[in-house]
């Protein structure tokens, strides 16, 4: 470590002076997107980082290469040297490392509490909402980076232009995705908040009461100082309803006529969206956004609203929009492959809520109108499938061919009537399409060999391990003849 690097670390750590007492930080579930980002930033700040997870992945390998000690499997001995233990939302009190930390009186904090410490003495920009958080966080980061402001960022997904989901910057700016799934975003004390939209999701956290969820978002916005800014999407009916209850400066964005930052003349040309952004007391911006879909135009407008309020130059905004490479697993183009049945385009997308799936379908339809849309869908969680069952059926019947995998349980027990077979039967009974249920992903090559045609757009959709499946298909280059042989 050079003298200059030591001085830089000292300056950064001086932002949180009381954290100097902390030497070693242990992350349970370190391989998750949200956890790994915080771990990487703290590692780069000079803290000793250890962590555990149930399996190796690319994230744990990268952290290990950077100097973290990563344990595969959870054991009480893993926390022996820890000053503090950070847990993800998926970790409960029965975890042996949590139990050992409690017994040793080692502080156990949630992910958002540690993120709040990173944000406490920085200029925090927090991005919340049911959908679009990861992409919006990446777009804000890209603009500030283009402007030479070198922000720290912690995102819930890969920022492709940076090659990572988190990075320690040299400025006081911290841009972070704020997670409402367990209400832990209430720990954050940002200077600027973005709320992209509010829908009924993660309702177990909120006792099944949508009013409680809405009030929690209001409470989140009221964590802003009195001089802070709430950047909200006025197109969302719930947000529009809540605006009179927000006692902070509100800046709106959207397609609506009364938006402070307004999108006009949107059109999609393949992978790119093109539109004009109209701002009060500023020149209009003609945007070329290098990711498709009206929903991404909204995400871009949120980022532009933040940057405009921070007086970032238009050149940086325009360069960030056209230069963005998007985020991992958000309409990610994995390639076009010449198969035994013809040329097929493969796209991978993380969307797992009906609204997210719907906007992905619309982006595919608008950008590639001549293509037949074949979707491999993996429902995520039985509880979400149960709660949004009819919405899923309504959205999924829009594709031309639907292949459905088993529900990715994410630790949940099966719920009768909320499984993939039931959902397939419901969609089939409506008469528009005939879904194909695939119980074992090993059967996918044979199924695809029988259904793919020249010019198809194959969309792998969901938040479980469907992303790995998509990459396996890409590695095979969708070679249907080889698939049939196997």
From Swiss-Prot:
Return the protein name. Answer: UDP-N-acetylmuramate--L-alanine ligase
Per the record, the similarity remark reads: Belongs to the MurCDEF family.
| Main location, first listed in the record | cytoplasm
Q: Which UniProt keywords apply?
A: ATP-binding, Cell cycle, Cell division, Cell shape, Cell wall biogenesis/degradation, Cytoplasm, Ligase, Nucleotide-binding, Peptidoglycan synthesis
Which Gene Ontology biological process is one annotated for this entry? regulation of cell shape
Q: Example GO molecular function term?
A: ATP binding
Q: What pathway or pathways are given for this protein in its record? A: Cell wall biogenesis; peptidoglycan biosynthesis
Q: Which residues are noted in the entry as ATP-binding?
A: 129-135
EC number, UniProt record? 6.3.2.8
Q: Which gene encodes it?
A: murC
Location in the cell reads: Cytoplasm
Instruction: Describe its function.
Output: Cell wall formation.
Recorded hits in SUPFAM superfamilies, A to Z, give: MurCD N-terminal domain, MurD-like peptide ligases, catalytic domain, MurD-like peptide ligases, peptide-binding domain
Q: Which organism is it from?
A: Vibrio vulnificus (strain CMCP6)
Reactions catalysed, as given in the entry: UDP-N-acetyl-alpha-D-muramate + L-alanine + ATP = UDP-N-acetyl-alpha-D-muramoyl-L-alanine + ADP + phosphate + H(+)
Q: Name one GO cellular component term.
A: cytoplasm
